Amino acid sequence: SCYNPCLPRSSCGPTPLANSCNEPCLFRQCQDSTVVIEPSPVVVTLPGPILSSFPQNTVVGGSSTSAAVGSILSSQGVPISSGGFNLSGLSGRYSGARCLPC
């Protein structure tokens, strides 16, 4: 199916952001951990001060995952609106029967 989670690869070569059957995998980092975003509704709300300054060492709500996602998005130039942002919007176009065949 098109919703299999992406598995980390052992090599750190260049990889596409998405391919036909692994579209839910939007971010792949060759670091200690890999951030995988699956097509389920996940809302990350960031408070005002972080939206203006994006400090790299800030932890949002005690969750380092939220801070990591915010840091990755801000470092790649993805705008984050003042009302927070919805990660499901990034993968919403891959839902239902719109999965491309392998």
UniProtKB/Swiss-Prot annotation:
The modification N-acetylserine is found at residue 1. Pfam families: Keratin. It comes from the Eukaryota. The keyword Acetylation applies. Keywords: Acetylation, Keratin. GO terms for molecular function: structural constituent of cytoskeleton. Belongs to the avian keratin family. The avian keratins (F-ker, S-ker, C-ker and B-ker) are a complex mixture of very similar polypeptides. This is Feather keratin. It comes from Dromaius novaehollandiae (Emu).
